[in-house]
């Protein structure tokens, strides 16, 4: 599969921002301490979240805030914002042997099922709101 760790870290970042945004200045350094990673990695992901309209970033006192209510942010929104591989979750072998009956037909035979799996995956991500995650913290 082609889902990187950025997705889970992005959800962690958004959850952290929501949890702390009214009580303290939420900076990339602060979030990095919660994620237990380098602030540079956090800033790279925040840049993608900001470009997707999920986060507002201000220098100084206010730090980061969510751009929208948590009830209107889905896991699909987060996934679409941070995953660099757009499109297919599964990669098919680009060069199956066209002279072999299996190689010649594997893309058609397998591709249909993988498309259905991906569609189901994306629909499930759209059903889960950031508020659902936050309610479990």
Describe the residue ranges of each PLM region.
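Short amphipathic alpha-helical interface segments
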Residues: 13-22
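Short coil turns linking two alpha-helices in DNA-binding domains
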Residues: 38-41
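Non-DNA-binding regulatory cores of transcription-related proteins
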Residues: 69-137
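Beta-hairpin "wing" of winged helix-turn-helix
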Residues: 53-67
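Short alpha-helical segments that sit at the start of domains
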Residues: 1-14
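A short alpha-helical element within helix-turn-helix/winged-helix DNA-binding domains
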Residues: 26-36
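Basic amphipathic alpha-helical segments that dock to polyanions
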Residues: 45-52
């Amino acid at each position: 599969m082609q889902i990187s760790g950025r997705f889970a870290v992005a959800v962690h970042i958004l959850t952290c921002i929501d949890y702390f945004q009214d009580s303290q200045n939420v900076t990339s350094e602060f979030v990095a301490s919660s994620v237990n990673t380098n602030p540079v990695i956090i800033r790279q992901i925040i840049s993608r979240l900001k470009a997707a309209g999920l986060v507002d970033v201000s220098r100084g006192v206010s730090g980061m805030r969510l751009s929208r209510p948590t009830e209107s942010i889905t896991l699909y929104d987060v996934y679409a914002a941070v995953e660099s591989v757009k499109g297919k979750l599964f990669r098919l072998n680009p060069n199956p042997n066209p002279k072999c009956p299996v190689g010649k037909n594997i893309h058609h035979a397998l591709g249909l099922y993988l498309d259905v799996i991906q569609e189901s995956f994306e629909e499930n991500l759209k059903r889960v709101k950031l508020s659902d995650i936050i309610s479990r913290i």
